[in-house]
Amino acid sequence: MPRVVPDQRSKFENEEFFRKLSRECEIKYTGFRDRPHEERQTRFQNACRDGRSEIAFVATGTNLSLQFFPASWQGEQRQTPSREYVDLEREAGKVYLKAPMILNGVCVIWKGWIDLHRLDGMGCLEFDEERAQQEDALAQQAFEEARRRTREFEDRDRSHREEMEARRQQDPSPGSNLGGGDDLKLR
């Protein structure tokens, strides 16, 4: 099953969901809402250093669980995210974040910043052209492999049917659909 839709760019540019989230808008950290604000600040900073966080787009209520690593790290042993993905040094009191993902079958990058004290900020989705091309190539390979396996199955099925038909042609006994009695034995 492919992880992406056939025309990712078109879906990103034309679907209302993506159009709304591709404009920079207000975001909030949504983790540990039941905890005191100071504890949430600490937990948010620790989560960022670990390469993950939960945010919500305020205007739409869309919640995302983000991972701040290159897309190629999916499923591999993770380390501390690089400054490209979690930048605590660019501006005092803020963290700049970047999270590549596949969202609704489209390769995107979430980019934004969050104020370390208020736990809110601004963010948006961008179309990830490079990853989209990679995923399209993987989907095409999977499609070609499935097509090859289907052809092999159909070829085996056809030769089996031809073999069975040849056996029927050789067996002159009326009402027999199979060959001789030996064909009925389990092998």
UniProtKB/Swiss-Prot annotation:
Subcellular location: Nucleus
Region named Disordered: 139-187
Classification via Pfam families: CBF_beta
UniProt modified residues of type Phosphoserine: S10, S159
KW Disulfide bond (keyword) present: no
Keyword hit for ATP-binding: no
Organ and tissue specificity: Expressed in all tissues tested. Highest level in thymus, but also abundantly expressed in muscle, lung and brain.
Keywords, comma-separated and alphabetical: Nucleus, Phosphoprotein
Main subcellular localisation: nucleus
Biased amino acid composition, Basic and acidic residues: 144-170
GO terms classed as biological process: cell maturation; definitive hemopoiesis; lymphocyte differentiation; myeloid cell differentiation; negative regulation of CD4-positive, alpha-beta T cell differentiation; negative regulation of transcription by RNA polymerase II; ossification; osteoblast differentiation
GO cellular component term, pick one: nucleoplasm
Molecular-function annotations in GO: DNA binding; transcription coactivator activity
Described function: Forms the heterodimeric complex core-binding factor (CBF) with RUNX family proteins (RUNX1, RUNX2, and RUNX3). RUNX members modulate the transcription of their target genes through recognizing the core consensus binding sequence 5'-TGTGGT-3', or very rarely, 5'-TGCGGT-3', within their regulatory regions via their runt domain, while CBFB is a non-DNA-binding regulatory subunit that allosterically enhances the sequence-specific DNA-binding capacity of RUNX.
Family the UniProt entry places it in: Belongs to the CBF-beta family.
Subunit organization: Heterodimer with RUNX1, RUNX2 and RUNX3. Interacts with COPRS. Found in a complex with PRMT5 and RUNX1.
PANTHER family: CORE-BINDING FACTOR SUBUNIT BETA, CORE-BINDING FACTOR, BETA SUBUNIT
Protein name in the entry: Core-binding factor subunit beta
Species name: Mus musculus
Gene name per UniProt: Cbfb
